[in-house]
């Protein structure tokens, strides 16, 4: 690879690091071209799966200000640059790795820090952002109705108490008039 080509490749990878919301580093040894194509399809349009030389990726990471990934760049390495929802892409990678034992997740990068394999798997186990937001909205709505019931309860209890006292007084008055 010519020096100019290397510089271009480093710049492209650095740009992908800068634009991505997250990245997952994998080892693809043993996967066929058709396996890689299937993985790319499963990741969707918001994720770019890039195979590159480790030395170029290391330089690009330094250029992009990404730290803590150097240990992951050994052996045949490919990076999934995620521009959309990290949970969806992590789920797709985890599912593909389960079906294809040759794909090994080495770690990742999100929110300015390196992620371990366990952290990437925990992200994959999360529910999607939309599901979490709908659960939060449901919980907030339920809490509001509970709070409204709590504020209304004392007034209804006072009304029932007043009605009971009125009935008792009426029963007492009718007993006195009968005597």
Curated annotation (Swiss-Prot):
Return one GO MF term: structural constituent of ribosome
Which InterPro entries does this entry report, sorted A to Z? Ribosomal_uL10 (IPR001790), Ribosomal_uL10-like_sf (IPR043141), Ribosomal_uL10_bac (IPR022973), Ribosomal_uL10_bac_type (IPR047865), Ribosomal_uL10_CS_bac (IPR002363)
Q: What GO biological process term is on the record, naming one? A: translation
Gene3D superfamilies listed in its UniProt record: 3.30.70.1730
Pfam families tied to this protein = Ribosomal_L10
Q: Which domain of life is it from?
A: Bacteria
* The family this protein is said to belong to: Belongs to the universal ribosomal protein uL10 family.
Q: Which HAMAP family match?
A: Ribosomal_uL10
Q: What does this protein do?
A: Forms part of the ribosomal stalk, playing a central role in the interaction of the ribosome with GTP-bound translation factors.
The record's NCBIfam families line, in alphabetical order, gives: PRK00099.1-1
This protein is called: Large ribosomal subunit protein uL10
Name the species this protein comes from: Mycolicibacterium vanbaalenii (strain DSM 7251 / JCM 13017 / BCRC 16820 / KCTC 9966 / NRRL B-24157 / PYR-1) (Mycobacterium vanbaalenii)
Gene that specifies this protein = rplJ
